A protein has these predicted regions:
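Generic helix N-cap/helix-start motif at coil->alpha-helix transitions
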Residues: 160-167, 192-201, 226-234, 261-267, ...
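Structural motif corresponding to the intra-repeat A-B loop/turn of tetratricopeptide repeats
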Residues: 177, 210-211, 242-243, 440, ...
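N-terminal propeptides/low-complexity segments immediately following signal peptides
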Residues: 20-73
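Extended alpha-helical solenoid scaffold regions that build the rod-like backbones
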Residues: 296-472, 477
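Extended amphipathic alpha-helical segments with heptad-repeat/coiled-coil character used for oligomerization
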Residues: 215-308, 462-469, 480-482
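Solenoid-like repeat scaffolds
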Residues: 96-98, 110-121, 135-136, 151-160, ...
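Solenoid-repeat scaffolds in large eukaryotic assemblies
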Residues: 180-183, 213-219, 245-251, 445-449, ...
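Residue-level signature for tetratricopeptide repeat
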Residues: 173, 202-207, 238-239, 435-436, ...
Length: 599
């Protein structure tokens, strides 16, 4: 593989190398590219994830500009790269030491609605390229949840891949999705003596994303080959954690004398050394001259319970806040904003948000609780009457807030929304209540609203009707006809009638309108659902072959847009349809309903 660049140069958390779609990795140009049989090094011609970052280089975490042709370009390039490769037979290890890297995962497929072989006979080369070309955060929270489950599934590695490299690809995508703890579960599932150079690099990144410098110690002997400038600092930190304080201090001072690394990076390593035994070291961290939050700086600062400056977090990608939300090093009150970002992405569940808000409630001085979000959430559960509970819910939804905060509000209030009985008098709140129920996956509770919403026949009830038409398991009692859809379209004020397009695409993909009705609506609104592209052929082929994992991965690749409203109806139709045909109808329904809530 290509020569590794050190983490201190290539680990920009807000770098340009992944086109603002994920943290810049510690990995060298060419990470994840097709490799010859491990471990023999050889050049590769596949495009790298992006140009390596230079010291201090950063690109603020601005939203990605929509480029709907990007998916097709990626798939075309993927097909060109996906050539067959010979795989060296795995090394034999004693039975009492072996954990088969070809069967790494923590979720049994049957428990998450997947077949035993979700990748089928798909080429590992093709799948690997799609994995590394998929960036987070995705436009759909439920698409991320579905993809995370597939990546964590304990299934046999697809044909034509070095098993450890397959784990590395999956863990790397999980990091790009903000799923640091999920990535750690994968990395922990294989023995370090089976690590390839690629796996070593990803494992180092995973340790830093999890604020776990001790996790680097298991890689200490392999790091010099792939991260030569990083290795001495890791050696010093591990020596300190092992109780060898004098040796650790000497290693740090030697690195400082060499002067080859930025002072902030040595100082942070020194702070970790100071946390060990028998070091007697006190280190002051000067953030003022620092304008870039690298993975190294994030990982070591949070490992020592030091929150990075807000200005650096603001410039970082959303994935970094998701890492922070899951970090155990900070009290709940310091992680509220990060947790909202993580909830909107799909990293934090509804139950996790309730737990976090409850911890923040307990941590906050009673005299300062009034008007805070933890106080509102408590009122949403135990308010003295319905109006007080609804008032608290409205405060958490934040109708006038940004999309991320609104989605986070729905996720946080999912369980509290169950306590509000369906009532026609709540027409103005019905869409938020139903959106919250679907955000938490409570489709059965949302179905209680069908009879009430069926009586809504104006714009105020349109979105609630559309979400129920798409999201409930059996929409019995809900009118889903061409006329009702056209009424929705007539009142649709979204730009380019995006909601109408997503509604028709979702209903057609779920099979809730017959092909003739879908065809007439497609022609009337110019949706282009009958158009064929490289991507549609691939995902339809995966569905036909019942490759549930491949279908989920390709569906997620179609959700790479700034907002779900910018996902073309064509992609939504084929994604939902493919998931339904591969036994993942529950996820398909949630993706479709979420699209109408957020568009």
């Amino acid at each position: 593989m290509k020569r590794a660049l050190p983490i201190l140069l290539a680990a920009s958390v807000a770098g340009a190398a992944l086109a603002q779609s994920s943290p810049e990795s510690i990995l060298p140009p060419g990470f994840g590219d097709p490799l010859p049989p491990t471990p023999a090094p050889a050049p590769t011609t596949a495009p790298p994830p992006g140009p390596s970052a230079t010291p201090g280089a950063t690109v603020p975490g601005t939203p990605r500009a929509p480029d709907l042709s990007r998916i097709e370009d990626i798939i075309t390039e993927t097909l060109a790269e996906a050539e067959p490769v010979e795989v060296e037979p795995p090394v034999e290890y004693p039975d009492d030491r072996r954990r088969d890297p070809a069967m790494t995962g923590v979720l049994w497929p049957a428990n998450i609605g997947l077949p035993g072989q979700p990748w089928g006979n798909a080429s590992a080369k093709f799948l690997s390229v799609v994995l590394r070309r998929t960036d987070g955060p995705l436009a759909s929270r439920w698409a991320q949840i579905g993809l995370r489950n597939v990546l964590l599934a304990r299934t046999e590695a697809p044909r034509g891949v070095v098993p450890a490299d397959w784990v590395a690809e999956r863990a790397w995508l999980l990091l790009k999705l903000g799923e640091a703890d999920s990535a750690r579960l994968l990395v922990a599932g294989i023995d370090t003596d089976t690590f390839t150079p690629k796996m070593v690099q990803v494992a180092a990144q995973v340790a830093l994303a999890n604020s776990d410098p001790a996790g680097l110690c298991a890689l200490e002997t392999e790091l010099p080959a792939v991260e030569p400038r990083l290795a001495p600092l890791v050696t010093a930190m591990c020596a300190s954690l092992a109780g060898e304080g004098a040796r650790a201090a000497a290693d740090i001072e030697q690195a400082r004398r060499r002067g080859k690394l930025p002072p902030i990076d040595i100082a942070l390593a020194d702070k970790v050394v100071g946390a060990g035994t028998d070091t007697s070291r006190a280190v002051t961290i000067e953030w003022e001259p620092v304008n870039l939050l690298t993975s190294w700086r994030y990982g070591l600062s949070t490992a020592t319970a030091m929150m990075p400056p807000e200005r650096l977090l603001d410039d970082a990608q959303p994935q970094v806040r998701a890492w922070l939300a899951r970090s155990p090093m900070f009290p709940a009150t310091q992680k509220m904003e990060a947790a909202r970002t993580a909830a909107a992405m799909g990293v934090m569940s509804s139950d996790a948000m309730v737990d976090l808000y409850s911890a923040a409630y307990d941590y906050t001085d009673p005299d300062e609780l009034g008007g805070t979000d933890p106080w509102r959430l408590r009122q949403a559960f135990v308010g003295k009457d319905r109006e007080s509970r609804l008032s608290a819910l409205r405060g958490l939804w934040g109708k006038d807030s940004d999309r991320v905060a609104q989605m986070a509000g729905w996720v946080t209030t999912a369980r509290a929304s169950i306590l509000v009985a369906p009532d026609a008098a709540l027409k103005d709140d019905a869409d938020d209540l139903i959106a919250a129920l679907f955000a938490g996956g409570h489709d059965g509770q949302a179905a209680r609203w069908v009879k009430v919403v069926e009586g809504f026949d104006d714009e105020a009830g349109d979105r609630a009707w559309a979400m129920l038409a798409l999201g409930v398991d059996q929409p019995t009692g809900l009118t889903i006809t061409q006329g009702r859809i056209e009424d929705f379209a007539d009142r649709d004020a979204s730009s380019g009638k995006r909601r109408t397009g997503l509604l028709i695409a979702g209903l057609a993909g779920l099979g809730r309108i017959d092909p003739q009705v879908a065809g007439r609506l497609n022609a009337k609104y110019g949706l282009g659902l009958d158009r064929k592209t490289v991507w549609t052929r691939l995902i339809d082929g995966a569905a036909m072959r019942r490759q549930a994992g491949t279908a989920m991965l390709l569906a997620a690749s179609a959700m790479q847009a700034p907002t779900v409203g910018e996902v073309p109806a064509l992609y939504m139709f084929h994604a939902v349809n493919a998931l339904r045909r591969t036994g993942q109808e529950g996820v398909a329904r949630m993706i479709a309903a979420e699209a109408l809530a957020r568009a």
